[in-house]
């Protein structure tokens, strides 16, 4: 039997990082077993559906390199793979369950259902349908239909006994039928299927062998198993993945930080870092490494390595991964990755519409200008310096701004180190001007030794010597390595900035 899995998101928002993990685990399982990875669009929630969200889904998977074998715009032997185009199929199978006695017509209107909910809430009863229409006679059903009363189709959940299934991660599970949400709707009065009907029918017709989804769907699984049995179909192997939590133990949400893949991408996380980190959320690998490429993961992924406990999303750890992957980039690659952030930052002024038309470069649906030869030459010089300090691509602009703009002279209290007074700091800056020509052509280590010798001669720490120089040359506490920065900026410009700071602040 060939393994066949699916990622079946609802395009009701930008792709959540938790959804990305579900897609990734399904993709990796399929590739590790030589199987098929299907992309199915579950767009039956038309009030929240958006074409933008659907396109974002395709863009996200393509950017991450998670190529699907069937579904989406690609199509395939089970087309269509978009649920809103399969309504006739769902109606047919809903009717089949009614005809077999496993489902029934329900004519209760919204007012009655609201009253039931209020009574249940007042009496602290579990919510759910009271099965008022479950035992209507054929004559009663016909009479209501003849009157044109709208109806839904509900699943007839057994009143006694239990439903059992085996989860690949959680083991054998048994659910008392009396605890299953009573008689859920399968087909709405407008002909739209609910998730439960469409999901089961599509998984069967598309030959899905394994259903890997978040553990939040576990309570729905007994009902799905009941439906499989009612149809006479073999259920797939279920595998409910551990939840992705914030550091407070709550489900990951915007209050914890970025949650959509779009946000991570726009902040400047690399796809390699996202793939690597997300693949480790709730899963371990036998060789115990930190760094895995997508091709590595395709070979190593195994359901037996999944963890039952929830996975905590650690933003700092993801940032660490991002930094590691940035250091693996060549200078040319890093320039290509960072340039869109610089170009769109306004560092080189606003871009008018005519310039945009001539630009010819795209990034996240934004047009940006190509760099001038001079801009690229300067930035290529700084790439080796920033590579060790960047954690996010979006940090690049503030790191290189001093090379293209004259920074404002910082206030004296920001220039003066905590352990020095104003007079000593002034002497540091004067000494830096004096020895600046000596660092011409030196690398960071050799140039740093020139400054270290002066710091030692003054009886102060190296950091207390370098900080005032860095602040006056770059205007910031954070910059590429100082000696290299001065070499790129030019010693004359660096001296002028220090002289200006002395004149204005000391």
Swiss-Prot record:
Taxonomic superkingdom: Bacteria
State its Enzyme Commission number(s): 6.1.1.17
What keywords is this UniProt entry annotated with?
Aminoacyl-tRNA synthetase, ATP-binding, Cytoplasm, Ligase, Nucleotide-binding, Protein biosynthesis
One short Pfam name that applies is: tRNA-synt_1c
Which GO terms are recorded in the biological process aspect for this UniProt protein? glutamyl-tRNA aminoacylation
From the record, which residues define motif 'KMSKS' region? 251-255
An example Gene Ontology CC term for this record = cytoplasm
- Quote the subcellular location field of this record: Cytoplasm
Stored InterPro entries: aa-tRNA-synth_I_cd-bd, aa-tRNA-synth_I_codon-bd_sub2, aa_tRNA-synth_I_cd-bd_sf, Glu-tRNA-ligase_bac/mito, Glu/Gln-tRNA-synth, Glu/Gln-tRNA-synth_Ib_cat-dom, GluQ/Sye, GluRS_core
Q: Which cysteines are joined by disulfide bonds?
A: none
Give the principal location in a single coarse category. Answer: cytoplasm
* HAMAP family for the chain: Glu_tRNA_synth_type1
Described purpose of this protein according to its UniProt entry: Catalyzes the attachment of glutamate to tRNA(Glu) in a two-step reaction: glutamate is first activated by ATP to form Glu-AMP and then transferred to the acceptor end of tRNA(Glu).
This chain's protein is named Glutamate--tRNA ligase
Instruction: Name the gene.
Output: gltX
